[in-house]
A protein has these predicted regions:
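A short, flexible N-terminal coil/short beta segment enriched in small residues
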Residues: 1-13, 61-62, 71, 76
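Non-catalytic C-terminal accessory region of glycerolipid acyltransferases
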Residues: 2-9, 13-21, 114-273
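Alpha-helical membrane-targeting segments
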Residues: 13-39, 92-102, 177-186
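Helix-to-loop junction immediately C-terminal to a conserved catalytic motif
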Residues: 22, 29-60
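Short, basic, glycine/proline-bearing loop/turn elements
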Residues: 29, 101-107, 134-138
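Short, flexible loop segments at the rims of nucleotide/cofactor-binding pockets, characterized by
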Residues: 31-37, 107-111, 141
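Structural motif corresponding to alpha-helix initiation and N-cap regions
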Residues: 42, 93, 114-117
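Catalytic core of membrane glycerolipid acyltransferases/transacylases, capturing the structured
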Residues: 50-111
Length: 273
């Protein structure tokens, strides 16, 4: 299903009546999309349940792909909202914090993972759609990284399905190691929703199944999105692009984590002087 930002106007009005904060944010995002000249293609929307909780598992290629990941649920009839899990720092920010809380998103405190997990399970049991990134962090290669088991464990604990989602094209707008292209990027964004995966396996096996399904869905979306210009930063190495290979991306991530650790240690040392 092809969609333009203008087609969301009536939906925003209906959502604002039900959840004023969420509806207002969607209206603002819709305006941004229209200004950016984005074009959307959505497939598999029928795979989202019309009622009840579900884990929305999403690939992670850029900083704003979450704004697109909720679009299939918004356009579903009846329209539904996704409560995204996001790092605690976003909730502590003086601007984004109040917004995230008003939208009833779920903070992830890495020093207290159990509390975040429990909050997500409660939301799922209450019938919410909870958005999760199984890769945890952005993939510089734009291929799927190794998955954490959190999505599977949540689905098992809450006894709800996992709904795979692939967002493709968002990395062209804003991703790691590359400048933002927020002004009039005019790029196509593809969003695909896979068939529900029931939580009938142990966490390790369920996580492996989820990754396999998402890999297949990713390749389908990539094939439909092409052809790809050779050497472009946003195109995976496998498809002839300039993105790092998964191995190279893993090395960059290790270096990034080491640099962050060194900076934290330096700040701690400075505080004690």
């Amino acid at each position: 299903m092809d969609a333009t930002p203008n087609e969301l106007s009536g939906l925003c009005t209906r959502l604002t009546a039900v959840e004023p904060a969420y509806g207002t944010v969607i209206a603002a995002v819709r305006l941004m999309w229209r200004t950016q000249g984005l074009r959307f293609t959505i497939t598999g929307m029928e795979n989202l349940p019309t009622t009840g909780g579900a884990v929305v598992a999403i690939n992670h290629t850029g900083y704003i792909d979450f704004t697109f990941a909720g679009l299939p649920a918004y356009r579903r009839k009846p329209a539904r909202l996704v409560r995204f899990m996001a790092k605690q720092e976003v909730f502590e920010h003086k601007i984004t914090g109040p917004i995230m809380r008003s939208l009833r998103h779920i903070p992830v405190d890495r020093s207290s993972g159990a509390a975040s997990f429990d909050a997500a399970v409660r939301a799922l049991q209450a019938g919410e759609l909870v958005g999760v990134y199984p890769e945890a962090t952005i993939s510089r290669s734009f291929e799927l990284k190794e998955f954490k088991s959190g999505a599977a464990r949540m689905a098992i604990a809450a006894e709800v399905p996992i709904i795979p989602h692939i967002v493709w094209g968002a990395q062209r707008i804003w991703t790691k190691d590359h400048p933002r292209k927020m002004w009039r990027p005019k790029v196509p964004i593809a969003i695909a929703v896979g068939e529900p995966i029931m939580p009938s396996l142990p966490p390790t096996e369920l996580t492996a199944l989820l990754r396999s399904r998402m890999q297949h869905l990713l390749e389908q979306v990539q094939d439909a999105y092409g052809p790809y210009p050779p050497g472009e930063f946003w195109v995976p190495h496998r498809l002839g692009g300039g993105a790092p290979t998964p191995a190279e991306a893993a090395e960059l991530e290790v270096a990034e984590l080491a640099e962050r650790a060194a900076q934290r240690q330096q700040r701690g040392t400075g505080a004690g002087d």
